[in-house]
């Protein structure tokens, strides 16, 4: 969390002992017309020195050693796993040309945004537990960190939503997906969401600054109280937190639930249809189909749960800060939420590579090659079907044991670029094993049709031809 994305910094950090109410009282008391009374600071008859006053409002300059060490260890583990995981995703996508797909471009964008946020946000966050005030980095760093951290947060949310939309179209509306398929479209979308995210984060960068407490007796500024935050007055007057909550949590959460719920229902429906057709087959195929269905649905559920768990505490804390400062035990609740929200917020940067990448067999093989130095690169051009989604059920060779060949009468209908000229349309007519060196995109049909290709085009044109209905069951992005 940071000076702008986290409400705790707008209230001087939830770990500070008497943060929100006393801080706002301080801001008001800087006006000479506002009389200072015992109710404002509860500092007795106010015999406090400036140093004692700062300690009363902001809490201790350094948190207890056990807490600082524990948080450093936990956040250090999050930092290492998050940086390593996201770096591996980026390196794998860059190194292997077979990974240059629309889906992986979204994953690359997500990994970069998570990396930037971890690098700019987490070290400073840990430092605050050891030295809460005065701020040592200055106003430029305060603004830059607030701006970049907020922007990267928005990029992550937008990327997850865009990625979910791609999956939804591929699974539920494959005929519509073909009209939009292509790397350039994915790059344009990613570029647009980065631009929109950075524009949306500009107010947080502009409004964040070094804030100070004012000594109530003479209204002088206490230099030792410097901290990076948005002005409490601005937070109360401009609904930055409310807008952020609606646009970057409520709406994305609703979209993700609807999209993945629809995808889960579609996968379940198709699996049940297959089981009905396969009643005469052996029980092993039925069990395998059921296992694949459960695996995919669990992954879909994991996406929704992960998004909610990682982001809800963060936004809940903002809302409590804005609307529940007068509730009983507010400070205790806010301090607990600070720890929970901070942990969940940064854990999302670590979990994303797992949820969206590591669950894919292709990524697991690539990671083993990268970490262990094993020469398994041939996997990417071997007999496995393209595995561009973490929801991949199986390879083409595992699912289709024999297919039949015929020449396509209209090959040009399938061309999407000049590199796609060496494709063969295969239809069930004569028995022929699927070549193990085929790089294929699986298309579920009533009469099996598979397109073998040697290009980077990742989704073939859905087609209705005679008695053939080509329906894309899995993501072909």
From Swiss-Prot:
Disulfide bonds join 142-228. GO terms for biological process: body fluid secretion; cellular response to desiccation; G protein-coupled receptor signaling pathway; neuropeptide signaling pathway; positive regulation of calcium ion transport. It is found in: Cell membrane. One of its GO terms (cellular component) is basolateral plasma membrane. Residues 1-72, 131-145, 211-237, 317-335 are extracellular. Keywords: Cell membrane, Disulfide bond, G-protein coupled receptor, Glycoprotein, Membrane, Receptor, Transducer, Transmembrane, Transmembrane helix. Residues 94-109, 167-189, 259-295, 357-447 are cytoplasmic. Pfam families: 7tm_1 (PF00001). In adults, expression in thorax and/or abdomen. It comes from the Eukaryota. The chain crosses the membrane at residues 73-93, 110-130, 146-166, 190-210, 238-258, 296-316, 336-356. One of its GO terms (molecular function) is neuromedin U receptor activity. Acts as a receptor for the neuropeptides CAP-1 and CAP-2, but not CAP-3. Probably a component of signal transduction pathway that leads to Malpighian tubule fluid secretion in response to these ligands. Belongs to the G-protein coupled receptor 1 family. This is Neuropeptides capa receptor. It comes from Drosophila melanogaster. The gene is CapaR.
């Amino acid at each position: 969390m940071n000076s702008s994305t986290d409400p705790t910094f707008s209230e001087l950090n939830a770990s500070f002992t008497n943060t929100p109410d006393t801080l706002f009282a301080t801001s008001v008391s800087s006006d000479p017309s506002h009389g200072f009374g015992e109710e404002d600071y509860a500092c007795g008859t106010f015999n406090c020195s400036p140093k004692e006053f700062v300690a009363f409002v902001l809490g201790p300059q350094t948190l207890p050693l056990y807490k600082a060490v524990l948080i450093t260890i936990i956040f250090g583990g999050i930092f290492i796993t998050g940086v390593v995981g996201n770096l591996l995703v980026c390196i794998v996508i860059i190194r292997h040309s077979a990974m240059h797909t629309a889906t992986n471009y979204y994953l690359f964008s997500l990994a970069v945004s998570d990396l930037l946020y971890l690098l700019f946000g987490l070290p400073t966050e840990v430092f605050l537990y050891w030295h809460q005030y005065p701020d040592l980095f200055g106003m430029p760093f305060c603004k830059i960190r607030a701006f970049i951290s907020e922007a990267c947060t928005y990029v992550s949310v937008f990327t997850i939503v865009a990625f979910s939309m791609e999956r939804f179209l591929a699974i539920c509306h494959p005929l519509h997906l073909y009209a939009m398929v292509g790397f350039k479209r994915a790059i344009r979308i990613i570029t647009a969401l980065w631009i929109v995210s950075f524009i949306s984060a500009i107010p947080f960068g502009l409004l964040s600054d070094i804030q100070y407490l004012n000594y109530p007796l003479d209204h002088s500024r206490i230099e030792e109280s410097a901290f990076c935050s948005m002005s409490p007055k601005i937070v109360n007057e401009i609904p930055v937190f409310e807008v952020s909550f609606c646009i970057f949590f409520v709406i994305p959460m609703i979209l993700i639930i609807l999209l993945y719920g629809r995808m889960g229902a579609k996968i379940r429906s198709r699996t049940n249809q297959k089981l009905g057709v396969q009643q005469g087959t052996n029980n092993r195929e039925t069990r395998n189909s059921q296992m694949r269905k459960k695996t995919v649905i669990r992954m879909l559920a994991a996406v929704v749960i992960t998004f909610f768990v990682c982001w809800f505490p963060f936004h809940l804390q903002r809302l409590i800060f804005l609307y529940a400062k007068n509730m009983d035990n507010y400070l205790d609740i806010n301090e607990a939420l600070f720890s929970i929200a901070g942990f969940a917020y940064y854990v999302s940067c670590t979990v994303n590579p797992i949820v969206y990448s590591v669950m894919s067999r292709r990524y697991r093989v690539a990671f083993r090659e990268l970490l262990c130095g094993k020469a398994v690169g041939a996997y990417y051009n071997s007999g496995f079907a393209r595995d561009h989604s973490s929801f991949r059920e199986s390879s083409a060779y595992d699912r289709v044991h024999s297919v039949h060949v015929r020449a396509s009468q209209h090959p040009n209908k399938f061309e999407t670029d000049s590199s796609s000229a060496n494709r063969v349309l295969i239809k069930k007519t004569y028995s022929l094993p699927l070549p193990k060196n085929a790089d294929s995109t699986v298309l579920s049909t009533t009469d099996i049709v598979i397109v073998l290709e040697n290009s980077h085009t990742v989704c073939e044109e859905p087609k209705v031809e005679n008695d053939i209905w080509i329906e894309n069951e899995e993501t072909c992005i």
